[in-house]
């Protein structure tokens, strides 16, 4: 962050009650680098509280928030600030996380997944004016917008999804900035990946439950496509679960004919769905190839095995 190529900025590092030597290291760095300020919290309060603490002590109108283990591209702030300063209706911007650890199959699969989820879907969502969520690992905010919505909430498991909905329900825009790069580490074990995805799913359900009553007014019409997309995804997941339950149940007991699942192998419609998925991955990787050392064909080989 201290290497960012922007003329005027400060770096605020929030130590969220760490029990290791993080506090000592940050204090030493603060003495070494003039532009670094450190905020120490007495005990771990969660990311939302840490973000609020950093925002409260900041002296500028614009905030660029990254995770402690993320590596910010030197030009990322420049690209994000362009959108925040040039468009007065923009309350937040979200960057483009790129995965560093690709030694395992899970790591390679997530490269394609991130290009699809973070890249292509956010580009598509912008066509109808709203984005489901900023990327928690790299996001920029206008402090005025944050103050209007009461900053980040402590009672939501995914503060990034929550703040995105709060800001957009107050009619602020969120822009996706693909050139604002940030390099991150992702889970490379099934257990770590499972916990992460359960957390993301729970976060989506929480915001849908919390803000559904606010959707029934004219100023929230642009949020309906995002809410509908989220709801359809949930229904899809439960249908897939039901298919598996009915299939395995049918192995032991008689299931009514109209409910019987004879095979888990995809039929012709499953093949069409798989081809559509592969086309989506190809397009997303092709668009993002400029940010990934032109290795999109190598990455595409691995997404073929995406479940």
List each language-model region with its residue ranges.
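Catalytic donor-sugar/metal-binding loop of nucleotide-sugar-dependent glycosyltransferases
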Residues: 164-182
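Acidic helix N-cap motif at the loop->helix transition within catalytic regions
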Residues: 20-28, 51, 75
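Acidic donor-binding loop at a coil-to-helix junction in glycosyltransferase catalytic cores
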Residues: 157-163
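A conserved acidic beta->alpha catalytic loop
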Residues: 15-24, 43
């Amino acid at each position: 962050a201290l290497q960012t190529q922007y003329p005027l900025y400060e770096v605020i590092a929030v130590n969220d009650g760490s029990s290791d030597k993080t506090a000592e290291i940050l204090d030493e760095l603060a003495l070494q680098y003039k532009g670094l300020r450190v905020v120490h919290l007495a005990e771990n309060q969660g990311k939302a509280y840490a973000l609020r603490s950093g925002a409260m002590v900041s002296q500028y109108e614009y905030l660029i928030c990254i995770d402690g283990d993320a590596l910010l591209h030197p030009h990322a702030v420049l690209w994000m600030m362009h959108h925040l300063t040039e468009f007065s209706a923009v309350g937040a911007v979200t960057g483009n996380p790129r995965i560093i650890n690709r030694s395992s199959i899970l790591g390679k699969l997530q490269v394609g997944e991130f290009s699809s989820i973070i890249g292509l879907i956010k580009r598509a969502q912008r066509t109808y004016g709203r984005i489901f969520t900023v990327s928690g690992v790299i996001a920029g905010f206008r402090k005025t917008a944050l103050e209007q919505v009461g900053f980040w909430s402590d009672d939501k498991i995914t503060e990034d999804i929550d703040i995105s909905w709060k800001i957009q329900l107050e009619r602020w825009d969120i822009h996706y900035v693909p050139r604002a790069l940030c390099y991150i580490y992702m889970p490379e074990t099934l257990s770590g990946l499972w916990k992460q995805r359960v957390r993301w799913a729970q976060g989506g359900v929480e915001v849908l439950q919390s803000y559904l009553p606010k959707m029934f007014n004219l100023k929230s019409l642009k949020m309906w496509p995002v809410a509908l997309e989220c709801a359809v995804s949930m229904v899809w997941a439960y249908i897939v679960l039901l298919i598996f339950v009915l299939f395995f149940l049918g192995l032991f007991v008689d299931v009514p004919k109209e409910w019987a699942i004879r095979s888990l192998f995809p039929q012709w419609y499953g093949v069409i769905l798989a081809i559509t998925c592969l086309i989506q991955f190809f397009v997303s990787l092709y668009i993002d190839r400029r940010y990934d050392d032109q290795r999109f064909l190598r990455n595409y080989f691995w997404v073929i095995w995406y479940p």
